[in-house]
Amino acid sequence: HWALGRKEANIWEKSPGQVVSDADLAVDRFLRGELEKLVPAAGWLSEETHIDHSGAGDELTWVVDPIDGTKDYVAGKTGWCVSVALVQNEAPVFGVLVAPAMNETWVGRAGRSATVNGRALVATQRRQYEGCRIPAESLPPDMKLVAVPKPNSIALRMAMVADDRADVVASTRWGHEWDIAAAHVIAAQAGASVTNALGETLVYNGTHGKALGVLCCSPNLYDEAVQRIGKYVSENGASH
């Protein structure tokens, strides 16, 4: 029922700053029913039903965010998507992002090329940090970086790196793996570097579902990005 510019009526906060709508719950129910039929052996971990950890630690698990970027969804903006990943042995092996408001479908599969609307993705290979593109509403001029449009969905921001629309996406928030699992496999298969904010391997389908931020960037900027983020975290700490 989403429409550009129309605000969603049935929304509430499940925790401070964490918005949920009727649509989140409806999509969650629909996806769980369909995906469990598709791979009956797989466990289930999603944003809306993460209290159920019956699947945590299973070899195969669906890791799902029914609407990533809910704030944009409920505000009638386009920067949201449905994020579905299949995780095997703690790594995402298949991921899909469906962004209906942008008419884009992103698909990634381990060992295969990633695509958007069927077109092969080639991630940014930028080498120079100064002047690199960062999804942001605004950036201080002294940073010498270029702000590009920022969807509320972290998954779509990572997808921008996968399609050479942005060069670095970083978050130092304690986030959740359902936000990034699908985008991780898409960006990695497109040639981007993807780790947690401190440059450590992201491990999926742990029982807590949490991850210390994410870094998704040109492989040629990765070392410098890790240094910059590490310095920031040591000075400011990680945010929640």
Which residues are covered by each model-predicted region?
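A short, compositionally biased
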Residues: 6, 80, 108-112, 188-189, ...
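An extended, acidic
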Residues: 122-240
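Short loop/edge segments at beta-strand edges and connector loops
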Residues: 46-48, 118, 198
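Residue-level signal for inorganic ion chemistry
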Residues: 2, 24, 35, 70, ...
